[in-house]
Amino acid sequence: MMRKPSQIVHCISCDLSCQLFPDSAVRVQYCHNAAFSIWPDGNAFLKKGFIEKLLLDRHNHLSSGFIFVDFSFPNLRRFTDLQWADSLANSGMHIVLISDRSLTPLANYWILKSNKIQGIIYSDDDDIVQQQKMHRLFTGRLANSKRGRTLNYTEFILLKRFVSGISIQQIVNIDNIDIKKLYVHKLRLKNKLGHSIHKIISNIL
């Protein structure tokens, strides 16, 4: 059985890196810093760049913090989990996607599907657009207008099956789909994501 990816969330507002969710560290209740987190943890370049570019000297006017989601290929497996957004939302924090170019169609799918996601920052958003989005988010407004291609439900389920290691013949049996139609959906999935299924699978954690 595949191990369920961790939903542990740590704060990046200071060097203490306190755990915020699912179990909040005791010292969090005495902290006066705004709670910001990047999830999943581990992308040091995103963390450093994001803090320096978008979080320093910016005031969050809301009572709850923000989880900025590293929506990139290595973390793809997490985003084919049907419950990932709902699980993070249980933290009480606002959810914002930081999407790379390849996963934009999947990010757009989740923007349409989930009302738990307050915003999205695309890889090609320029500095002005990024700053405008952050201002909207930190003043209680949404910044989740999508642009670009979007996976449909069938393509999402097909991606989920492939990521889970299920073969084409197994997918035919599980989803009762004609194999010719399956290959058509597979080709469309490849065109939207810009990579073959084999390359996609080989680049995830």
Residue ranges and their predicted role:
Residues 1-113:
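DNA-contacting interfaces and partner/effector-binding or oligomerization modules
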Residues 45, 128, 188:
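Short alpha-helical
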Residues 52, 132, 160, 184, ...:
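DNA-binding alpha-helical recognition surfaces that contact promoter or target DNA
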Residues 98-103, 109-137, 183:
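Output/docking surface of receiver
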Residues 134-148:
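The C-terminal output helix
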Residues 144-184:
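Helix-turn-helix DNA-binding segment
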Residues 190-205:
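Basic, Lys/Arg-enriched C-terminal extension of HTH/homeodomain DNA-binding domains
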